[in-house]
Design a protein with these regions (language model features):
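Radical SAM enzyme [4Fe-4S]-AdoMet core and its adjacent flexible, acidic
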Residues: 2-103, 107
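Flexible mid-to-C-terminal extensions adjoining Fe-S/redox cofactors in radical SAM and related proteins
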Residues: 104-166
Length: 166
């Protein structure tokens, strides 16, 4: 069922301290038009570990970016430490210097080597059709990720950022 969590135990985010499996949540174009409402629905359902899976057309990179940035905007102000979103956790881990590549994953292709966000993505043999959307998300989330990385370096939890944004 799209737009609803699938009861699929997925991987745990780097540094995740509990055993809550990620819930796969399929994101379609209509969810991208109301990202705040969709995220509020997931919160209301009590999800605490989410893996967004885009089910979008190749030309929908801007929609994907809009969705990710809107959800991140709310999450960074209200839900750090309460709701674990896999993409956000992996992005923060990359900002903290952790390697995100999985064993056996294909190497980045030559079109990706010049990308300033290569260290954050898991591109494979070909560029993701939603790559522009991910890049826009990385641009948007970068300043917040930088602060959360610095908080971790100071032995403080990333959620210490939330009061600063209110």
């Amino acid at each position: 069922m799209t737009g609803c969590p699938a009861n699929l135990p997925l991987t745990h985010a780097p540094g995740q301290q509990h055993d809550t499996p990620f819930q796969a949540v399929v994101v379609e174009a209509h969810h991208c038009h109301q990202p705040q409402a969709f995220y509020a629905q997931l919160r209301q359902q009590g999800l605490t570990a989410i893996h967004f899976i885009p089910q979008l057309a190749a030309g929908d990179a801007a929609l994907w970016a809009e969705f990710l940035c809107a959800v991140f905007h709310r999450w960074v102000r209200e839900d750090i430490g309460r709701i674990n979103i896999l993409l956000f956790s992996e992005t923060l881990s990359a900002w903290c210097g952790e390697t995100l590549t999985q064993p056996g994953a294909p190497a980045a292709n030559s079109t990706c080597y010049g990308c300033p966000w290569l260290r954050l993505c898991r591109c494979g043999e070909q560029e993701d059709p939603l790559c522009a959307g991910y890049r826009q998300f990385y641009d948007f989330s970068g300043p917040y990720m930088r602060v959360m990385r610095d908080l971790r370096r100071q032995q403080r939890p990333p959620e210490a950022l939330m009061p600063l944004l209110r």
